[in-house]
Amino acid sequence: MLNANRLVSPSKFSTRPLYLQVRDALAARIAGGEWKPNAAIPNESDLAREFGVSSGTMRKALDLMEGERLLTRRQGRGTFVNDQSSEELAERFSNIHAAEGERIAGESKMLNIVQAPASPAECARLRLRADDKVWRIQRVRLHKGEPFLIEEVAMPAALFPGLDAQEMPNHRIVVLAQQYGILLGRGEERLSIGAASPSVAETLKLKAGSPILVLDRLVHDLDGQAVEWRVGTGHFADKYYLAEIS
């Protein structure tokens, strides 16, 4: 996982391409809190001099970070650190839309949070060892006061120390990641159809056996480490799931 202590400056002894070493060092400044969300960073020339690399190498590193949504260049104003918890960036992990078309995350109702040894399934999905621990979170998402999604979440406990002491541990992964200095990368989501169990039916106000959509999502950090496994069980009578392909 990227962190502020892993890399301070590029090394001539590394076999990793130089622009990737520079990207790692710059990303570590964001993860470590040295560069705050929405803050302007030094210009390309100053950074190239600081790191002792060419302007082309620095530009390539910054281009990559812009593609990873860590930075945004604004013509005539400079380069700024993106707020990973902003609605604009959080949308990439939220594919549920209301009938009117807008994306919805919904309000969250926490049911339970506990730290426990990782199950075999959690070890497999999160790539953990058998003796690792996870945070397990159960919550319900509501839209306009009505429940539409039950979430079962597992996250590596080592990445989120003291999570149960948070005033609002039901934050979305984009918020938690920013709080804990984790830079999010890609996510993947599997969709399947199931039938509502009696307990699910009661929570979602359905008849037992009603068709439900199961959303199995895995979110990784920039280094490819899995940071959240979430299984959502939902009923979208007046909502829909949208996957954009480009």
Each predicted region: which residue ranges?
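N-terminal leader/targeting segments and the immediate start of mature chains
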Residues: 25, 66-67
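Beta-hairpin "wing" of winged helix-turn-helix
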Residues: 34-38, 67-76, 82
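Extreme N-terminal segment that seeds HTH/winged-HTH DNA-binding domains in transcriptional regulators
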Residues: 1-53
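Short, hydrophobic-biased segments on the C-terminal half of alpha helices
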Residues: 62-63
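Residues in the helix-turn-helix
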Residues: 57
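Residue-level "edge-of-site" marker
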Residues: 42-43, 78, 190
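All-alpha effector-binding/dimerization core of bacterial HTH-type transcriptional repressors
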Residues: 4, 83-246
